[in-house]
């Protein structure tokens, strides 16, 4: 039986590790990065009156937007302040009104 040369074995290991890293990058890191960017843009586009859902499942209407917090009106007399990161989506069926550009 022939034995592989040490250089060939080392080259195979390097190629294998690079392939593992590339798979890890394209299957885990890149999709998470895209999702973070999408969520950041979503948070920047929020305005008063938008109907949203929090990560804990609370539905409400945006009444105030701070630097790091958002206050939602969840009932007639109930307002709750959340961290911006807790807002995850618009309510189903809610259509955001686009500002008209003249």
From Swiss-Prot:
Q: How does it sit in the membrane?
A: Single-pass membrane protein
Disulfide bonds, which pairs?
Answer: none
User: Principal place where this protein is found?
Assistant: membrane
Q: Which UniProt keywords apply?
A: Cell inner membrane, Cell membrane, Membrane, Protein transport, Translocation, Transmembrane, Transmembrane helix, Transport
> Which GO biological-process labels does this protein carry?
protein transport
A cellular component term (GO) from this record? plasma membrane
Cellular localization per UniProt: Cell inner membrane
List the InterPro entries hit by this protein, alphabetically: Preprotein_translocase_YajC
Q: Which residue ranges does UniProt annotate as crossing the membrane?
A: 9-29
Pfam families documented for this protein: YajC (PF02699)
Function according to Swiss-Prot or TrEMBL:
The SecYEG-SecDF-YajC-YidC holo-translocon (HTL) protein secretase/insertase is a supercomplex required for protein secretion, insertion of proteins into membranes, and assembly of membrane protein complexes. While the SecYEG complex is essential for assembly of a number of proteins and complexes, the SecDF-YajC-YidC subcomplex facilitates these functions.
Similarity comment: Belongs to the YajC family.
Subunit structure, per the record? Part of the SecDF-YidC-YajC translocase complex. The SecDF-YidC-YajC translocase forms a supercomplex with SecYEG, called the holo-translocon (HTL).
Q: What is this protein called?
A: Sec translocon accessory complex subunit YajC
Its gene is yajC
């Amino acid at each position: 039986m022939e034995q592989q040369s040490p250089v060939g074995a080392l080259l195979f290991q390097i190629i294998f590790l690079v392939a593992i890293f590339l798979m890890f990058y394209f299957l885990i890191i890149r999709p998470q990065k895209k999702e973070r960017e999408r969520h950041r843009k979503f948070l920047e586009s929020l305005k008063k009156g938008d109907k949203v859902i929090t990560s804990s499942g609370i539905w409400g209407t945006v009444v105030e937007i701070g630097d790091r917090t958002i206050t939602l009106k969840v009932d007639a007399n109930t307002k709750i302040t959340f961290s911006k990161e807790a807002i995850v989506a618009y309510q189903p069926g809610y259509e955001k009104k686009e500002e008209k550009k003249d």
